[in-house]
Amino acid sequence: MRDLKTYLSVAPVVSTIWFGALAGLLIEINRLFPDALVFPFFSF
């Protein structure tokens, strides 16, 4: 039961950090390449 409580207290923290980092990354990509449907560094 203690392990379950530990898991339930860790999972929201990890997911909040993960989604915050992902949102920050998407915001920075959209700041550098606004309205980009195809990113310039993917086209060769």
Swiss-Prot record:
Family per similarity comment: Belongs to the PsaJ family.
Subcellular compartments: Plastid, Chloroplast thylakoid membrane
Gene3D superfamilies with a match to the protein in the record: Single helix bin
Membrane topology: Single-pass membrane protein
Protein name: Photosystem I reaction center subunit IX
Lineage: Eukaryota, Viridiplantae, Streptophyta, Embryophyta, Tracheophyta
UniProt keyword Transmembrane helix present: yes
Major site of localization recorded for this protein: plastid
Domain of life: Eukaryota
Any Gene Ontology CC annotation: photosystem I
Keywords from the UniProt entry: Chloroplast, Membrane, Photosynthesis, Photosystem I, Plastid, Thylakoid, Transmembrane, Transmembrane helix
One GO term (biological process): photosynthesis
InterPro entries in UniProt: PSI_PsaJ, PSI_PsaJ_sf
